[in-house]
C-alpha cells in the first residue's frame, strides 16, 4: 500500500512541478528545460531525509537476488549512470537497488553541455526524454578519492564505474 501511495504522490508532484516549470519558462521566454525540475526533485528527496524509514527503506523482496560474473546483486534492479550526488545515490540504494553503476567518468573535470540539455520527447503519443547532458563530472582523480570514501560500500552491493575518453 505504501508503494502505491508513494507512486501516486510522485506522479502528482512530477506533473505539477513540470507544468509550473514550463509555464514560467513560457512566460519568461526561456527554452523548455527539465533540468530545474530534476534539481528540485533531488533537493526535495535530500531535504525530507528525516522521513527515510517511511519513504526510502524498502525491503528487497526475498529470492530476487541475481548473480552476474561472480557478483551477487540483492535485486535485479541496478542503477546505471544516472546520478552522481552521494545523497541521492544513498537514497536509491535504501530503496532497494541491487547495485549501482556510476555516471561515466572522464580523465579531466567536465562541465557538460550548455542548458537546455533535458527535454520532453513526444512521438506518435509515445513519451520519452531527450538527454544531451554531455558527461559532466569531477574527473578521475577526484572520483577515485570519492569512491574510496563513499558510504555506499556499507550496502555490500556491487558498485561499477563507466569510464569514457575523448577521440
Locate the predicted segments by residue.
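N-terminal capping/small domains of soluble enzymes
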Residues: 2-158
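Active-site glycine- and acidic-residue-rich loops that bind
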Residues: 163-167
Amino acid at each position: 500500500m505504501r508503494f502505491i501511495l508513494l507512486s501516486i504522490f510522485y506522479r502528482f508532484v512530477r506533473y505539477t512541478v513540470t507544468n509550473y516549470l514550463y509555464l514560467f519558462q513560457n512566460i519568461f521566454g526561456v527554452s523548455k528545460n527539465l533540468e530545474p525540475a530534476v534539481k528540485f526533485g533531488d533537493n526535495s528527496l535530500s531535504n525530507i531525509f528525516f522521513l527515510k524509514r517511511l519513504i526510502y527503506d524498502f525491503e528487497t523482496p526475498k529470492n530476487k537476488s541475481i548473480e552476474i560474473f561472480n557478483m551477487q546483486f540483492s535485486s535485479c534492479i541496478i542503477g546505471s549512470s544516472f546520478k552522481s550526488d552521494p545523497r541521492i545515490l544513498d537514497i536509491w540504494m535504501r530503496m532497494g537497488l541491487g547495485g549501482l553503476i556510476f555516471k561515466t567518468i572522464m580523465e579531466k573535470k567536465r562541465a557538460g553541455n550548455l542548458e537546455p540539455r533535458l527535454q520532453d520527447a513526444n512521438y506518435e503519443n509515445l513519451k520519452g526524454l531527450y538527454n544531451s547532458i554531455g558527461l559532466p563530472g569531477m574527473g578521475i582523480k577526484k572520483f577515485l578519492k570519492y569512491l574510496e570514501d563513499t558510504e555506499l560500500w556499507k550496502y555490500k552491493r556491487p558498485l561499477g564505474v563507466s569510464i569514457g575518453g575523448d577521440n
